[in-house]
């Protein structure tokens, strides 16, 4: 494993431990080169309450690896989380920089009604 990936995973592990202590529902983001994924995970970490990604049928048609696609995923996960009764979440960026697609997803989720 590369040093860059090890560092990202270490940051993610530390953040998740802190969120586990606080017992909050978290919005977890994973970013690959072609897609972006978002899940709202219960406080105990055992159940996914809502999810969205660029692999969803309605988002798959357009470009999937850009900022516009990340915004659509953020809006969709916010809608699904609100339908599941979740409005307050902790943002888990999985060690990725809060920049570009990750930031676009977070901003769209906030506009969709989720509170971080």
Curated annotation (Swiss-Prot):
| A Pfam family that the UniProt record links to this protein | Ribosomal_L18p
Any one Gene Ontology biological process term?
Answer: translation
Q: Which InterPro entries match?
A: Ribosomal_uL18_bac-type, Ribosomal_uL18_bac/euk
- CDD domains recorded: Ribosomal_L18_L5e (cd00432)
Molecular function via GO = 5S rRNA binding; structural constituent of ribosome
Q: Name one GO cellular component term.
A: cytosolic large ribosomal subunit
Summarizing the function annotation, the protein's role is: This is one of the proteins that bind and probably mediate the attachment of the 5S RNA into the large ribosomal subunit, where it forms part of the central protuberance.
> What name appears for this protein in its UniProt entry?
Large ribosomal subunit protein uL18
């Amino acid at each position: 494993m590369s040093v860059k990936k090890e560092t990202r995973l270490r940051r993610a592990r530390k953040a998740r431990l802190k969120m586990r202590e606080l017992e909050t529902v978290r919005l977890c983001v994973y970013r690959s080169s072609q897609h972006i994924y978002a899940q709202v995970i219960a406080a105990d970490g055992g159940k996914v309450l809502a999810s969205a990604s660029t692999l969803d049928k309605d988002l798959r048609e357009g470009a999937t690896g850009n900022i516009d696609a990340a915004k659509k995923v953020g809006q969709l996960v916010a809608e699904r989380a609100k339908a599941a009764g979740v409005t307050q979440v902790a943002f888990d960026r999985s060690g990725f920089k809060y920049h570009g697609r990750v930031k676009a997803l977070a901003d769209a989720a906030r506009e969709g009604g989720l509170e971080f």
